[in-house]
Regions:
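Glycine-rich FAD pyrophosphate-binding loop
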Residues: 4-8, 18-40
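Predominantly flavin-linked oxidoreductase catalytic cores and closely associated redox partners
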Residues: 8, 94-200, 213, 229
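N-terminal Rossmann-fold NAD(P) dinucleotide-binding loop
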Residues: 12-13
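N-terminal FAD cofactor-binding segment of flavoenzymes
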Residues: 31-72
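Short beta-strand to alpha-helix junction loop
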Residues: 42-46, 77-94, 177-182
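Helix-loop-beta segment of a Rossmann-like dinucleotide-binding subdomain
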Residues: 70-86, 164-175
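FAD/FMN-dependent oxidoreductases across multiple families
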Residues: 79, 99, 179-249, 253-254
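C-terminal helical "tail/cap" subdomain of flavin- and related membrane-associated enzymes
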Residues: 251-323
């Protein structure tokens, strides 16, 4: 079987590396980047389970960990967790570098994998069921002192501060309701409050928050990672899901059961649709107590360890911000 992969992010490179190791004929096609860090999306946060997946690629994950924290501050409240802040550009280079930048001919491949994320370049044949996107903007800054990991709820989203070592941070925000200029101003005000020594770089982008978009297999085109809608709406976490879905797809290609990949993704990530529905309610300022169980699952997947009181606190903050 000959496999073409379009998109050289986490999902695309992970799939490429596994299939090459297993002896498949596989080509990886990259996309032109417009950011200083040469990645999109510009994310650095993940969790212990995801770090373990990195180890399965024959890569030493600890070499790419910038910092590890056992808590995060959410609207001023300290919540326990096991969180990793990674050097994503360096990790991507370690996973795969043999990348083509010409346009693939679909007829050259038995399977063409769309790993293009928000763009879904080759997935027009796949129904885009109730798609949902949020706008985000972010700055990488150098600070005078220690920075704590933090999230602060805003209307339709949140502001974040992600440590990249001891004196550097990724500071940004995103919303599914506010216009991009409003998000940019909130983030810029947040950055100014931190009084950074230097703003290293800045960028804006969209992120898919639709939940899984099925089917993920249509003829010879297959979606993976964000292209398949596999992003956790709470926190817009997509690194873990990108690794995991790529590994699942690699196993199904190896077993010659490509059609079984759709069922496997539904079984593993179907719960993300429930999280999407909760976020739809959040936008209206409505967060049911019945949603706490699903919210807990999402936060645990992202590396947090919230108590019931933590969940109730977050629920109240979401309702207040989205009145």
């Amino acid at each position: 079987m000959r496999v073409g992969i379009v998109g050289d992010g986490i999902a695309g490179r992970t799939l490429y590396r596994i299939l090459k190791i297993r002896g498949f004929q596989v080509d990886l096609y990259g996309q032109e980047k417009y950011t200083r860090c040469d990645i999109r999306p510009c994310g650095f946060a993940t969790d212990a389970s995801c770090i373990n997946l990195v180890g399965k690629l024959g890569v030493s994950p600890q070499e790419y960990v910038l910092r590890r924290d056992n808590y995060i501050i959410v609207n001023g409240r300290r919540i326990k967790g096991d969180l990793y802040w990674i050097d994503k550009p360096k990790l991507l280079e370690a996973i795969a570098t043999d990348i083509r930048y010409d346009k693939p001919d679909i007829d050259d491949y038995d399977v063409l994998v769309d790993a293009t994320g928000i763009a879904r370049v080759y997935s027009s044949v796949i129904p885009d069921f109730n798609d949902k996107k949020g706008i985000s903007c972010q700055h990488r800054v150098i600070l005078n002192g220690y920075v704590a990991p933090a999230f602060d709820v805003i209307r339709g989203g949140y502001l974040w501060t992600i440590p990249l070592g001891e004196r550097e941070a990724h500071v940004g925000g995103g919303s599914t309701i506010l216009p991009s200029n409003a998000v940019q101003q909130l983030v810029l005000d947040h950055v100014k409050e931190m009084k950074p020594n230097e703003i290293v770089c800045s960028c804006s982008e969209s992120v898919r928050l639709s939940g899984p978009i099925f089917p993920v297999v249509s003829d010879k085109v297959i979606t993976v990672g964000e292209s398949a809608g596999l992003v956790v709406s709470f926190g817009a976490a997509g690194i873990h899901t990108a690794f995991e879905s790529a590994i699942i797809l690699a196993d199904h290609i190896y077993e010659g059961d490509v059609t079984g990949y759709d069922k496997a993704i539904r079984r593993r990530f179907g719960w993300l649709r429930g999280i999407r529905k909760i976020w739809d309610s959040v936008e209206k300022g409505q967060v049911s107590l019945l949603s706490l169980g699903a919210s807990y699952r999402a936060l645990r997947y992202e590396g947090l360890k919230p108590t019931l009181m933590d969940l109730l606190y977050i629920r109240k903050a979401l309702i207040e911000a989205n009145k």
